[in-house]
Amino acid sequence: MSLFTMNEGYGYNDIYSLEESRVTDALKSFKEKVVYLFKRSNEMIVISKNGVTNNAVKQDVEKTANFIEKDIKTVENSNEVSREDLTTLERFKKRLEDKLEKWDKEIKELKFKDEGIGTKVINTIKWSFIQLKRIFTKILKLLVSAISAIYNKIRGVD
């Protein structure tokens, strides 16, 4: 048994390791929230197709989108970003683009003919698609700006 033990809670942390942990925490949070946002958006679409609007789900999706924006800005404004972080952001960018294309197709295919469904339900479904598309487009724009900022930092262009 040694006389001295090292406690991780009191270890030496320099500025770079703190910055790196802040970036990795933001990326982990970003990943979790994007997955959660995809799940909730699918729930929102299913609920709106049934003709019932749920304000709690809409607010939850909006709040999650705002958290994602904060995480993206944290990563974008950091000084220490690796190429792995960049590829992670690019993968999420591709996922969002695919999701938006899928929703565009679904919106175009929404045609209710003689099924007895009222215009209120149709408008609700279209509204939910438009709101989700707006949120994901906003996140996509932030991702693109973050990726370009990270590329410039890696290349040394300010």
Please state what every model-predicted region is.
Residues 43-58, 74-86, 111-115:
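Charged, low-complexity interaction regions
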Residues 34, 41-44, 68-75, 103, ...:
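Non-transmembrane amphipathic alpha-helical segments
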Residues 27, 34, 38, 85-158:
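Membrane- and interface-active hydrophobic/amphipathic segments that mediate membrane binding, fusion
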Residues 1-25:
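Short, conserved micro-motifs composed of acidic
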Residues 3, 21-46:
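Terminal accessory regions that mediate trafficking to/through membranes and regulate activation
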Residues 16, 21, 62, 73, ...:
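Intrinsically disordered, low-complexity regions of eukaryotic proteins
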Residues 26-38, 55-69:
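Short amphipathic alpha-helical heptad-repeat segments
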